[in-house]
Amino acid sequence: LIDLVAELLRTGLIDENGILHSGQERSDTFMLVPPQETVFAQCEQNMSEDAQSEKTECLQRNEKNGSGQSRFENDCGVYLTQKDIGEVQLAKAAIAAGIQLLLKKRSIEESQIQTVYLAGGFGNYMSAENAARIGLIPESFVKKVQCVGNIAGEGAKIALLNKNERHEIENAVRNMEFLELAACPEFQDCFVDELGFER
């Protein structure tokens, strides 16, 4: 989903406010995108000769579904609605605002962060470049991202098998500070600022 939104943002089918546009509205920009560089390259390879002659239709379709909601759809049956984009904006704004408030809380700059650990399945399959493109993480974090997989499960195993490591974990937990974002006066303003997409 992050990759798709990032690609549509890059091609201009999604604007800075998250509005989904039709291929016809952005046809001048869209025609310049080589198929092999798009997320729909596989779709094009699977098309018949008749469909190949109208391959832009696969990339440009933006129609209404039964409820009258705008959506982007390709010939492979994959579609993205305006509501989906809105949900992405809400999620990425909350995370981006959280990052900015944590930096502010510790009085540090983005450049001082050495490594950004992404845990779980989410981190394993996320493109840091596309995450930055939609504003989920700062651009300066892209080359610092390290995917660590199921680190919670690994940590639990280590804690169960090694007393010294368990004590170290317990000490870290005792010294950990918890930042309740909803209780931060600046959160709402920061959240609203992060809702849009920078292009």
Predicted features by range, described:
Residues 36-76:
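Intrinsically disordered, low-complexity terminal tails and inter-domain linkers enriched
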Residues 1-44, 72-199:
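Helical "lid/coupling" subdomains associated with nucleotide-phosphate turnover
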